[in-house]
Amino acid sequence: MISSFHRPTVARVNLQAIKENVASVQKHIPLGVKTYAVVKADAYGHGAVQVSKALLPQVDGYCVSNLDEALQLRQAGIDKEILILGVLLPNELELAVANAITVTIASLDWIALARLEKKECQGLKVHVKVDSGMGRIGLRSSKEVNLLIDSLKELGADVEGIFTHFATADEADDTKFNQQLQFFKKLIAGLEDKPRLVHASNSATSIWHSDTIFNAVRLGIVSYGLNPSGSDLSLPFPLQEALSLESSLVHVKMISAGDTVGYGVTYTAKKSEYVGTVPIGYADGWTRNMQGFSVLVDGQFCEIIGRVSMDQLTIRLSKAYPLGTKVTLIGSNQQKNISTTDIANYRNTINYEVLCLLSDRIPRIY
């Protein structure tokens, strides 16, 4: 999708805020712990290349979702370690090795397939994934992990790390978290040849369970200034939300009582009122269920009326503002603020999803 630079809808990304957020977490965790910046999904919509470059002096490496995301960073000149968190099938190994990209291996079936395809792992750096209770990918016993590590070494791989992922680190009830932690610790204790790096801490674990950190952390949503729990748990230190979203009024008119607005005529004016049109819609990630939510104009909350269209939405105004008047969808406007978490709560989803749905059609300004 092409970025639309010739309309007023833009996302502004504060790279300094991201750097300061990472620094705040690093002060909170034990000394000597390695930091991986999680920049998958285009750095949660913030721009993977720009964020990675900004964090280059602060972090030890990066985590991405797939090989294409890793190659994007390499092609941009990022020379630190890049770990693919998802599973890379053996037929892509050559490209990973050629670009010094670390891969995750999560099953003995992977080894069987690599041998079937006569793939060697010489020069390949690997982190082994353990399923301690998340239920997606990973091995479930020390016996399996020992066999996998031995097999990988036979194929020439460097098994650098082993890791797991917690399902409920961002929840007040830590029963499941503790079950997973004990499972992982027991599995690690049963290894015959423990890898150099052991990591289980995502953003939530890093800030609320810092006493359980091994020797590396993976910092995702906290880097971008958002609470991993939404608003369920209090942050131990302040964060700065790094992305703001703004547009401008491109059309303003008066409508009369009985006039309708939008597809499906879901809004009917009860009296004469001013309506403004803003050039952002569900193709930009501003979803249709945002009808009834508010944006900020001149420090005032203005309700979205009528259905959100593909490219536009309409808002009720208190007066006839001039064309070009700033509209804030995420961020501050004259001491009033709309956070990504506010939007997530309205949509009954999580702040991660709100950011990741912001499409490439919205230019990112740094």
UniProtKB/Swiss-Prot annotation:
GO terms for cellular component: cytosol. GO terms for molecular function: alanine racemase activity; pyridoxal phosphate binding. It catalyses: L-alanine = D-alanine. Substrate binds at residues 136, 310. Disulfide bonds: none annotated. This is Alanine racemase. Its EC number is 5.1.1.1. It is an enzyme of class 5 (isomerase). Catalyzes the interconversion of L-alanine and D-alanine. May also act on other amino acids. The keyword tRNA-binding does not apply. Belongs to the alanine racemase family. Its cofactor is pyridoxal 5'-phosphate. The keyword Membrane does not apply. Keywords: Isomerase, Pyridoxal phosphate. Pathway: Amino-acid biosynthesis; D-alanine biosynthesis; D-alanine from L-alanine: step 1/1. PROSITE patterns: ALANINE_RACEMASE (PS00395). The active site is at residues 40, 263. HAMAP family: Ala_racemase. One of its GO terms (biological process) is D-alanine biosynthetic process. The modification N6-(pyridoxal phosphate)lysine is found at residue 40.
